[in-house]
């Protein structure tokens, strides 16, 4: 899986840890005859200041948004290659940060490309070799900056999961500052409680038909917060985590826990009786709030329940990892930027690697947090498996 929350400390409160990027691990180059046979799919993304209402009845707030120039969901097919142009209309240099891409496309923003300057643009080719749920943001260099910045959700289809409808819920938190406008992570929130948005807008009801099978792509677009979602009166079956298939399992009590950047694909079958409502609650460990509702109406789509969905087909990643010959690397993280950890804005790919390893050898990273605050850990360009003390791979 591409991204997990670990109890790690940031270098300082403004830096995202990216010291493992670069020579530390050789990112695989992905090729596909299917990808090469298709014409590239154009995609234009723009980062710009906007004013947007984040909750019903509230005045518009100043935020920085990452938006596609075309309307509609960003849904693509496995095997597509995106001809992606990024235009930076923000007053600061910016790079795009991808969650779920494989190999070189995910590492290029730090390894091979300069940040896009204010008013500048850049065009890259992004092969979508695997199906799954992706996220993109423009926050890598901006923690503690002038404004809070939103994220984007992308879906890559053809993973074998059949549902009547595909719903994406990109959940983001915004913390109003003293001026009433959301502050960027790393800036003082003045103790203000968060405002949660769904797909960049105030939360809304999700209309359904009785008997409908829904595929939900739940995404925690927060930069730091761990959130829990609880869906009342619903059997929630998890199918994929962080864009990678999982052995299907029911969410306990209809609850999903998502670290910052985590994506969970789940299936929910709407009851066949008309007029049912399922409340979606969100909790950040301090408060629990209503986020949205699944509301059914109209004629039933079907009256006989569907069988549970089968597991998604293999995505090419191994079911087991042989750890007997794995290289073990111990990494200690503290609040002081030093030889081991470098803030993204200062990253230099010609610097000394954190460690070296031969291609195709398994690596076990043992990370120790020496500070008092948590941080997100993003291993660019690689999937990894979170191990417990009894895990043998």
Specify the residue positions occupied by each region the protein language model found.
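N-terminal edge beta-strand
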Residues: 57-75, 194-205, 338-359
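Short, hydrophobic/aromatic beta-strand segments
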Residues: 93-99, 225-231, 375-379
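Extended terminal and domain-junction accessory segments
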Residues: 33-48, 144-176, 246-374, 381
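Asparagine-centered strand-capping/turn motif at beta-strand->loop junctions
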Residues: 86-90, 219-220, 367-371
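N-terminal secretory signal peptides
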Residues: 1-11, 22-24
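Extracytoplasmic/lumenal soluble domains of exported proteins with redox or metal-associated functions
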Residues: 34-136, 144-145
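Histidine- and aromatic-rich segments of cupredoxin/plastocyanin-like copper-binding domains
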Residues: 105-118, 127, 171-173, 178, ...
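Short tyrosine-centred short linear motifs in exposed loops/low-complexity segments
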Residues: 79-80, 120, 128-134, 211-212, ...
